[in-house]
From Swiss-Prot:
Gene3D superfamilies on file: Ribonuclease Inhibitor
Coiled-coil features, chain-numbered ranges: none
InterPro entries, sorted: F-box-like_dom_sf (IPR036047), F-box_dom (IPR001810), LRR_dom_sf (IPR032675)
Name under which the protein is recorded: F-box protein At4g02733
Sequence ranges assigned to domain F-box in this UniProt record: 91-146
Length: 301
């Protein structure tokens, strides 16, 4: 009598297939478990984990916690991938713009919105990789999440399309004191307080950047025509002036709330950035504001 068994089968392969089916069944039961007002899934998790962690030594408990976190992290990642696939299918059917027009639309939105769109689905992510989308990089709405790495990545993506860069926190609190606020202390002589602190501490945003945050502009700065920097706190002059000197095609420069000396910046612009049409420099620690519009230049002390 001939055997009807599959010649390619083996106890090991059969065991693996059974384990996969068993695992699929467990996960399917978990994710399809119906919601019930009388049963809190969260409370069930707590009860099960508390019970499991109540026995065994510390090393076993640690392994259980790590294993649980890892497996639910895998479930979360898998859910996100499946959700993105569904979104890609939906958007590919309902999105009526061709990729060329989509790229143009993406190039008109702020960079935070661009990143949110690119995370929606693969189709939008592919469009968001086009350098034209980074023609205008505006990170003012994402200041809490921006650091050297993010800035460098976006500048690299822009390739030769970069023309405008906005960085920092636009709505950061300004300084209410000017340079004329301190002379009254002369009247008090030696009786003046030994310690005096005026103004606000630099915004927390500045701590996300290092001295080298603008270094990529040494290579791509000549592409920029507009550069706006807001409230980055204290900056090293040389680390700022060297990249700025590469921005020879700037026509619009705005620096607000950055504690650097303004005079060296003006001297550098006079030498290297002769195309400037609009210039606004504000430094509350010096109590000075410089504005240049076309051929008009004036100083507010």
């Amino acid at each position: 009598m001939l055997s009807t068994e599959n010649p390619n089968s083996s106890p090991l392969s059969d065991s693996l297939e059974f384990n996969e089916r068993h695992l699929d069944s467990i996960i399917s039961s978990l994710v399809t478990f119906p919601d019930s007002p009388s049963l809190s899934i969260s409370s069930s998790f707590d009860r099960v984990l508390d019970h499991l962690l109540s026995s065994g030594d510390v090393s076993v408990q640690d392994q259980l916690v790590d294993r649980t976190l890892e497996r639910f992290s895998l479930l979360l990642q898998s859910t996100k991938r499946c959700s993105q696939k569904r979104a890609t299918l939906h958007n590919s059917i309902s999105w009526f713009l061709p990729s060329e027009l989509t790229v143009k639309v993406f190039s008109m939105v702020d960079t935070k919105s661009l990143m949110q769109a690119s995370a929606c689905c693969t189709m939008f992510n592919n469009c968001a990789m086009d350098p034209l989308c980074y023609f205008h990089i505006d990170l003012t709405k994402a200041f809490k999440h921006v650091d050297d790495r993010v800035l460098r990545t976006l500048l690299n993506r822009s390739g030769k399309q970069l023309r405008s860069l906005k960085l920092g926190r636009v709505d950061a609190p300004g300084c209410l004191f000017r340079s004329s606020c301190l002379p009254p202390l002369i009247l008090y002589g030696n009786n003046a307080r030994r310690a005096l602190k005026l103004g606000r501490d630099p915004p927390g945003l500045g701590s996300l950047f290092t001295r080298s945050c603008f270094d990529p502009l040494k290579l791509t700065g000549n592409l920029l025509t507009s550069l706006h920097i807001y409230s980055l706190g204290f900056m090293n002059m040389n680390s700022f002036l060297d990249p700025l000197s590469a921005c020879s095609n700037l026509t619009d420069l705005k620096i607000v709330g950055v504690n650097v000396l303004l005079e060296p910046i003006l001297e550098l612009l006079a030498r290297n950035c002769c195309l400037i049409e609009h210039l606004f420099l504000d430094n509350c620690s010096q109590g000075k504001t410089f504005t240049w519009w076309g051929f008009l230049y004036f100083t507010v002390a």
